[in-house]
Amino acid sequence: MTSSADRSPVEAMVSHAEGAISEDDIVAAARERAVDLGAGPVTPAVGALLSVFARLSGGKAVVEVGTGAGVSGLWLLSGMREDGVLTTIDVEPEHQRSAKQAFSEASIAPSRTRLIGGRAQEVLPRLADESYDLLVIDAAPADQPDFLAGGIRLLRPGGAVVIHGASAGGRAGDPSANDPDVVGVREAARIIADDGRFTAVLIPLGDGLLAATRD
């Protein structure tokens, strides 16, 4: 176990950021269900940051790839407008049932969430161009390029994209690493970098967040 004295300043900062965020009982219950399902919920600090992005982006229409058990959705909804709608996509029906339970426990009106079951590669093309304020991708790193390529057209001018898992477990910065997850996160970063409409930043929370705003 690493002691506080052995941690780098960056590790200490991240630990402090995570410890500074508290979650209510509803989010905590959703987190517990996510762990039971193996859904890999976002950390509290990542959730809080998603709430901030939802608010800053306008928060009227948000699309999420990777519903999980609803932890990230609860955080996103907390930052969205009262009339904002979260569209969230997941291939696992059990995940979406758990998320629906979380939204109900949080007394979120059914009209504010649209849960779509299916593969994101098939769902995203059915959504309208330039109709969303924020795109959140929380999925397997190897799939990030496909989801980003299919979702980037959904963003209105001034919108933003946030990709969770952008560090691939810390391996993305290792020049010798070339497994599918590392290749995926690097390709997603390249797509953003090559698109002149976006300004991007890598944030060292959770498993790394790649965030970018569209001009």
Curated annotation (Swiss-Prot):
Keyword vocabulary terms for this entry: Methyltransferase, S-adenosyl-L-methionine, Transferase
Enzyme Commission code(s) on record: 2.1.1.-
Binding site for S-adenosyl-L-methionine: V42, E64, G66, T67, S72, D90, V91
Top EC class of this enzyme: transferase
Residues reported to bind substrate: D138
Gene Ontology molecular function: any one: O-methyltransferase activity
Alphabetical list of Pfam families matching this protein: Methyltransf_3
Family: Belongs to the class I-like SAM-binding methyltransferase superfamily. Cation-dependent O-methyltransferase family.
Lineage: Bacteria, Bacillati, Actinomycetota, Actinomycetes, Mycobacteriales
Keyword Methyltransferase carried by entry: yes
Superkingdom of this protein's organism: Bacteria
Designated name of the protein: Putative O-methyltransferase MAB_1361c
One GO term (biological process): methylation
UniProt cross-references to Gene3D superfamilies, sorted A to Z: Vaccinia Virus protein VP39
